[in-house]
Regions:
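Boundary/entry segment of secreted carbohydrate-active catalytic domains
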Residues: 35-72
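Substrate-binding cleft and catalytic face of glycoside hydrolase catalytic domains
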Residues: 75-202, 206-233, 299
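Substrate-binding cleft of secreted/luminal carbohydrate-active enzymes
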Residues: 290-324
């Protein structure tokens, strides 16, 4: 989901993962502290920093709780975050979230020990439940050409990461919030329907595009887990429909990804439903689940209790891999 408050709440969830405080001393004679070590294993406590390089270019600074300017990823690590999520666009305006930008951020994250989730949108801009726009360079493709484009793009980006020495790719999303599939062709006529990856019109195409991405991921990072990601984690029917269609058409995935964006007046019910759905879906489809996105207006006094409930609840479910 395109979160217009994304820049403002970049660190909100990370604060809930904090495991130690930070301190400083003005005593010049103080004994230097040993370099701190960080446990980056286990339950994924993640943050999406896809906007980071553009924010830095615009002069945005980040500060720790003592008011000291700190590089963003280092600050996230200090606060207990152990995983980073990065979105990939095909040919974005300005290059932000394109291949080279993703490589630069992934390399920085790996140097700090972060595990990585790479999130392919298969679009030149935001892909979400209302927008799954075919990249400009892929317009007019047949279904076979579209499938090949998915495979080539996925393999190209991941190979570039691997060639750079990035080895910490643990998860790869094939599509972003694909409630009704991806790579939509909404023109009229049979030709459009033969190409679209909209599940309600051509579920077989969606499964084929997902599988093209899945196989490309495994060709580069065999151990990486492939995520199919859907919004509204509180809505069980949305998931059983989508994954039912995907399964029926031979689609492949390793992990189910969820988004959840509750509000002040509904977060108690939505979070309870989401936690229950994690258990139901992991049992029904024999796979793990991960919260790929979660958020709430940062200024709400309900944001912290909502996040605490979800972090604690997800940790208590053995089939939930983490929360971003």
């Amino acid at each position: 989901m395109k979160n217009i408050l994304g820049k403002a709440i970049l660190l909100a969830s990370a604060l809930l993962f904090s495991i130690t405080g930070t301190s400083c001393s003005n005593d010049d004679n103080a004994t230097p502290e040993k370099e701190k070590t960080y446990d980056m294993s286990g339950f994924a406590k993640g943050a999406d920093v896809s906007w980071l390089t553009e924010m830095e270019k615009d002069g945005v600074k980040f500060y720790n709780q003592n008011g000291k300017a700190t590089e963003c990823m280092k600050l996230l690590r200090e606060e207990g975050t152990n995983s980073i999520r990065l979105r990939v666009w095909v040919n974005p305006e300005g290059g932000w979230c394109g291949k080279d930008d993703v490589i630069a951020k992934a390399w920085r994250a790996q140097q700090l020990g972060f595990r990585l989730m790479i999130d392919f949108h298969y679009s030149d801009t935001w892909a979400d439940p209302a927008h799954q726009t075919v990249p400009a360079a892929w317009q007019g493709y047949t279904a076979e050409q579209m499938k090949q484009a998915v495979a080539d793009h996925t393999k190209d980006v991941l190979t570039a990461l691997k060639d750079k020495g990035v080895t910490n790719v643990e998860w790869v999303q094939v599509g972003n919030e694909t409630r009704d599939g991806m790579l939509w062709n909404d023109a009229e006529g049979d030709d459009a329907k033969a190409v679209t990856g909209r599940v309600s019109e051509n579920a077989a195409n969606f499964a084929a595009y997902v599988n093209a991405g899945y196989d490309a991921v495994k060709a580069v990072y065999p151990q990486a887990k492939v995520i199919v990601h859907v919004d509204e984690g509180n809505n069980l029917g949305r998931y059983t429909w989508l994954f039912g269609e995907l399964k029926k058409n031979g689609g492949k995935w390793d992990v189910i990804g969820m988004s959840l964006y509750p509000e002040d007046n509904n977060w108690q019910d939505l979070t309870t439903n989401c936690l229950n759905n994690i258990k139901t879906l992991s049992e029904q489809y024999n796979c793990n689940v991960i919260i790929s996105e979660i958020g709430m207006w940062w200024g709400s006094d309900q944001a912290a209790p909502m996040m605490k409930k979800m972090v604690d609840g997800c940790k208590a479910i053995s089939t939930c891999e983490g929360i971003f």
